[in-house]
Amino acid sequence: NHLYDLIILRDVIEHVEDQPRLMARLAELLAPDGVLFVAYPPWRMPFGGHQQMAVSRFAAHCPWLHLLPGPLYPWALRLAGETPGKIAGLLEIRDTRISVRKFRRLAAGAGLRTVTERFFLINPHYEAKFGLKPRCLPRLLEVVPWLRDFFATTCFCLLQRQE
């Protein structure tokens, strides 16, 4: 069994069905002084449902569309002309969604502690994709959980084993 000084998990955890098992395994693989870097889009952010992957311009550019309750989300996707396969993929992301609160619980449950956590209003990888400069979430939005959850486009988190 090899232990790792650094493990990077970027934009992955929101696609994993068994998130507690993943986090527990990552904690097992982490060296005692090792660092786990996790980046994830909080579920309630404007495109937390990954609907930007939709084919229709409406669905791909409609912020918070994924937050429609129950059957309204797949109905809206069908109405926009999405294929059954695309809808199934987007609903799968809804099933594996991750919020800031859920991520913190998963980390603690795996015996990990947060070293640092940074929230971004403009995700750093949007610079390469869209030419937008990264911007941290303003402190006022960061300290109010519901505002943070709706406006943070990504969270960068460094974790270590609890001592």
Regions found by a protein language model. Give the residues of each.
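Short catalytic micro-motifs in class I SAM-dependent methyltransferases
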Residues: 10-15
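A short acidic, Gly/Pro-enriched loop at the edge of an enzyme's catalytic core
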Residues: 1-7
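S-adenosyl-L-methionine-dependent methyltransferase catalytic module, highlighting the catalytic core
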Residues: 17-25, 35-160
